[in-house]
A protein has these predicted regions:
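Exposed aromatic-hydrophobic patches
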Residues: 26-39, 62
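Local beta-strand/beta-hairpin segments that build beta-sheet-rich folds
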Residues: 11-14, 28-32, 56-58, 167-175
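Catalytic beta-strand/loop cores that center a nucleophilic Ser/Cys/Thr
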Residues: 43, 105-107, 123-175
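Extracellular ectodomain segments of secreted/surface proteins
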Residues: 1, 66-70
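Short alpha-beta junction capping motif
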Residues: 70, 75-123
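Beta-strand-rich binding/interaction modules
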Residues: 1-20, 30-33, 43-53
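Edge beta-strands of extracellular beta-sandwich domains
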Residues: 57-67
């Protein structure tokens, strides 16, 4: 059987995959699960749980669903490719700045960013790149209102983080 739930336990779907003999091994298809996603109007993290009834055998996987159409708000964020005077002025007055400087950063460019779990982080193997193991996120920040996340990176971060350029803030002012 399978269940599809959100983080609050709200059921989005469920059913049976039928009964079949399962050989010992890996990557054995249990069947096909189809779910209509069109009714989902805002981004949501879901969890698929598959269980063999009458046993303790259970496994689950997280996945994220985003609506096909979204309405964006222009907001009050200054977007720039460099930490220019306007960005500094905006920050000085408590404003918001997004720096999209990929490929233009020199300090920290020796740090190679890939989206790898700790187990496969090559820092364990002669310090070859990549040198990162993920991110730490303030998941309660208002900017994540429509982007379901936890305090750490997960698979929904793949497109945003994999092979992106690192920006090191070691010598930036603390303020």
């Amino acid at each position: 059987t399978y269940l599809i739930k959100d983080v609050n336990g709200i059921l989005y779907g469920g059913g049976s995959l039928g009964r079949k003999d399962l050989p010992i091994g890996n990557n054995i298809s249990l069947g096909c699960i189809k779910m209509d996603l069109s009714a989902i109007e805002k981004p949501v993290k879901l969890n698929l749980e598959v269980r063999i009834q009458g046993t303790d055998a259970v496994n689950d996987w997280d996945f994220w669903v985003y609506p096909a159409q979204v309405t964006t708000q222009s907001g009050d964020v200054y977007i720039t490719e460099t930490l220019d005077k306007q960005a500094l002025d905006i920050l000085e007055t408590g404003g918001k700045v997004l720096i999209t400087a990929a490929g233009k950063i020199s300090y920290g460019k020796n740090i190679v960013q890939h989206f790898t779990p700790v187990f496969w982080n090559t820092s364990w193997f002669k310090m070859r790149p990549p040198h990162t193991t993920g991110i730490w996120v303030n998941e309660h920040h208002p900017m994540f209102k429509e982007f379901p996340t936890e305090y750490h990176s997960n698979l929904q971060w793949w497109e945003l983080l994999n092979k992106t350029q690192v920006m090191q803030f070691t010598h930036f002012p603390v303020e």
